[in-house]
From Swiss-Prot:
The lineage of its organism: Bacteria, Bacillati, Bacillota, Bacilli, Bacillales. It comes from Staphylococcus carnosus (strain TM300). Belongs to the ATP phosphoribosyltransferase family. Short subfamily. InterPro entries: ATP_PRibTrfase_cat (IPR013820), ATP_PRibTrfase_HisG (IPR001348), ATP_PRibTrfase_HisG_short (IPR024893). The gene is hisG. This is ATP phosphoribosyltransferase. It is found in: Cytoplasm.
Length: 205
């Protein structure tokens, strides 16, 4: 049996929609009707539901054979002992720098994504101070704790409703399928079958 780690939250909703579009209702229904269970089994696949940033850890430690997570998570810690295998056609969004309309000088930036933020401003040759937050990043700009934020944007609605505007898009994000390195060989056929059931080309990058 394969164990697949799924990100809870927005990406899980996108995954369910993707399954439904591809008529994979067995998996979709099992996930939708899981109630509060953190692990479920459907069609010989065990799905475990974890925080998005923890998906690579469960895969790396061998608890899960496969993980589905956002490329944003993988960019923050790129040197994990996993196979960063293929792109998946859902979960599309982007990183953006956002600020109040009247802000002209960005020196302090709040974000959850410290590496992405530091790399971007270093490439621009801009010296900034980074404040790391784990949630509600927009609030830091709203209350003037920082000049700007770097966060994931899908529709921009949350930014606009809090009086912020996108200044620059700094990187695209999508879902990625990752595998445990040992499972990649010991369960190669099962992994290949899982990907085929998703309706995704193994060679799609």
């Amino acid at each position: 049996m394969l164990t697949v780690a799924l990100s809870k939250g927005r990406l899980l909703k996108d995954f369910i929609k993707f399954l439904e579009r591809n008529n994979n209702h067995v998996w979709a229904d099992a996930i939708i009707h899981r109630e509060r269970k953190l692990q479920i089994t459907a069609d010989s696949i065990k799905f475990i539901l974890v925080k998005g940033s923890d998906v690579p850890t469960y895969v790396e430690e061998g608890i899960a054979d496969i993980g589905i997570t956002g490329s944003d998570i993988l960019k923050e810690r790129p040197n994990r002992n996993i196979n960063n295998y293929i792109d998946l056609p859902f979960g599309e969004c982007h990183f953006s720098v956002a600020a109040k309309p009247n802000v002209t000088n960005i020196q302090r930036v709040a974000t959850t994504y410290v590496k992405t933020t530091r790399d971007y401003f270093n490439q621009k040759g801009t010296d900034i101070s980074i404040i790391q937050l784990s949630g509600s990043v927009e609030l830091a700009a709203v209350v003037d704790m920082v000049d700007a934020i770097v966060d994931i944007v899908q529709t921009g609605t949350t930014l606009k409703s809090n009086g912020l505007e996108e200044r620059e898009q700094i990187g695209e994000i999508n879902a990625r399928l990752i595998t445990n390195k040992h499972s990649f060989f010991s369960k190669s056929k099962a992994i290949e079958n899982f990907i085929q059931q998703l309706g995704v080309s193994i060679h799609a990058q």
